[in-house]
């Protein structure tokens, strides 16, 4: 991975697709515009906007309670994710990264109690304000679309994964895209292998006082690009210096903010200079015109 990050800009040209009218949208009135959510999840954008931020939607008191519970449980158990040679993070919850269906569900079953223990700090109403399960179920059902957890045989996806990104060098989270890793699901027919889109949904539980901005580039890498950089099944990492001339946007997120983002676009998190950044989230994918699922 070190060799990849030191590639000279003249050695590699990143190829892929871009959006016209690339940008993002915000809601600040506490009302979620489901048309925007639907278009990002089903089509990857809303008139070119690949990110939708809903400001101050979740209770800051609930976010703070979860953040404190997260810190306590990570201190006690060390979290659920060991150093995998890719990213350094404190984590509670499962990840499908580098796992097929069988491996992912095994991991989900291993860590589910940790997620349940963490969520004990919330009520059913709190959980809905954080993850919008009932809202998304209702809105999609009205359009004849099923929304729910991804399934592999008799197992279901993790409810959500909580992460605090640590120091990963140039950035807290290096530029990457999240479609490539779905390739592992093809090994055993895990249904997310059929996803046509990958949307990242996150709620910011704790915001950094310095740095930690979400950054998105106007580029969806193609398979040739992945192969050139050796990230065909991980989508991680893309060298930041190769993106210097690529259109991008940076957004500061605060505790209580929710966001939906087209995770097929290259994105990352800038270095944190003060404080720390904690999010909880999941991926959402459109399998077909009648089914949308989430996983972690």
UniProtKB/Swiss-Prot annotation:
Binding site for Fe cation: 176, 178, 267
Group of enzyme by EC: oxidoreductase
Cofactor descriptive note: Binds 1 ascorbate molecule per subunit.
Gene3D superfamilies listed in its UniProt record: q2cbj1_9rhob like domain
Keyword annotations of the record: Dioxygenase, Iron, Metal-binding, Oxidoreductase, Vitamin C
This enzyme's EC code(s): 1.14.11.74
Cofactor entry: L-ascorbate; Fe(2+)
An MF annotation (GO) of this entry: dioxygenase activity
UniProt catalytic activity: L-isoleucine + 2-oxoglutarate + O2 = 3(1)-hydroxy-L-isoleucine + succinate + CO2
Homology family: Belongs to the iron/ascorbate-dependent oxidoreductase family.
Function: Catalyzes the hydroxylation of L-isoleucine at the C-4' position to form L-4'-hydroxyisoleucine (4'-HIL). Exhibits low activity with L-valine and L-methionine.
Matching NCBIfam families: isoleu_diox_hilA
UniProt-recorded name of the protein: L-isoleucine 3(1)-dioxygenase
Gene source species: Pantoea ananatis (strain AJ13355)
Gene behind this protein: hilA
